[in-house]
């Protein structure tokens, strides 16, 4: 994929093709090669070198423009569900990167969020429309409407919301051929990383990211029946345990089965997931 990306970049640079005139291949795997290269170069451990990406924004903008090209719009209905799922995950994550880069460095005054938060950008998620696959959609519409149709709650922890509290942004694009495996990896990593999940037998607590509560019905529908037998627990509590169950250590499983734990949602960390100048504390 690295060689392919380099070849594509060389051809485009040599031809001097403007982003709006670039007609991409309608094949999904080839379409996402540029994003794959950008993520590999600028993302580490879910954090982004935004200053460096800002200098590379031409390629990012060109990739996003390609997602709404006529060839893509006409080919989209022929893609499989997995190809469409990968497409929208990549589109969302790329659009968040573009949004941050356009306003970087972020310095906002809204007291409800950190000064460098993507939430300091007015309307970033709920108001700004983006042309993707022939539609005009906000980021919230992509998440709440388009991605919701796949009935796969793993997608919500695969979204890079431009925040430290988001699921870990991968250093590769999602692929239609591999998206199910990639999402399994996202889930497994999420379930064992203290940033998102803490199982503490000594304090009797299971602390988890609020992302699962934001999308409670989706997680309940997929994971509640996978829980241990936990009488008198709410559906979302059973769903959380069903979600975590395949990834529990023996001691953690023993603690959960006692059914004495308290489930708590940690505050979402809206600090920018920026690696420029060092990791966030």
For the regions a language model picked out, list residue spans one by one.
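Positively charged n-region of N-terminal signal peptides that target proteins for export
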Residues: 1-4
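N-terminal signal peptide c-region/cleavage motif recognized by signal peptidases
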Residues: 13-18
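Interaction/scaffold regions that mediate signaling and macromolecular assembly across diverse proteins
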Residues: 21-281
């Amino acid at each position: 994929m690295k060689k392919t990306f380099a070849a594509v970049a060389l051809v485009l640079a040599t031809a001097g093709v403007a982003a709006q005139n670039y007609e991409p291949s309608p094949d999904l795997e080839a379409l996402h090669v540029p994003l794959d290269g950008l993520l590999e170069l600028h993302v580490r451990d879910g954090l982004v070198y935004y200053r460096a990406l800002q200098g590379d924004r031409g390629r990012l903008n060109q990739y996003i423009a390609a997602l709404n090209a006529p060839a893509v719009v006409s080919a989209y209905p022929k893609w499989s569900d997995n190809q469409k799922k990968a497409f929208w995950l990549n589109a969302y994550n790329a659009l968040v990167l573009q949004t941050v880069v356009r306003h970087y460095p972020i310095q906002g005054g809204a007291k409800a969020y950190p000064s460098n938060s993507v939430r300091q950008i007015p309307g970033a998620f709920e108001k700004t429309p983006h042309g993707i696959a022939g539609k005009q959609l906000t980021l919230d519409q992509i998440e709440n409407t388009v991605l919701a149709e796949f009935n796969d709650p793993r997608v919500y922890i695969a979204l890079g919301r431009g925040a430290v509290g988001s699921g870990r942004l991968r250093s590769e694009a999602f692929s239609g051929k591999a998206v199910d495996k990639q999402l399994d990896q996202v889930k497994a990593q999420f379930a064992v990383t203290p940033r998102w999940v803490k199982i503490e037998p000594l304090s009797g607590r299971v602390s988890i990211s609020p992302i699962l509560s934001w999308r409670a019905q989706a997680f309940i529908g997929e994971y509640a029946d996978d829980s241990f037998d936990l009488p008198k627990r709410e559906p979302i509590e059973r769903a959380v345990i069903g979600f975590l169950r395949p990834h529990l250590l023996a001691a953690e499983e023993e603690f959960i089965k006692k059914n004495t734990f308290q489930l708590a949602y940690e505050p979402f960390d809206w600090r920018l997931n920026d690696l420029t100048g060092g990791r966030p504390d």
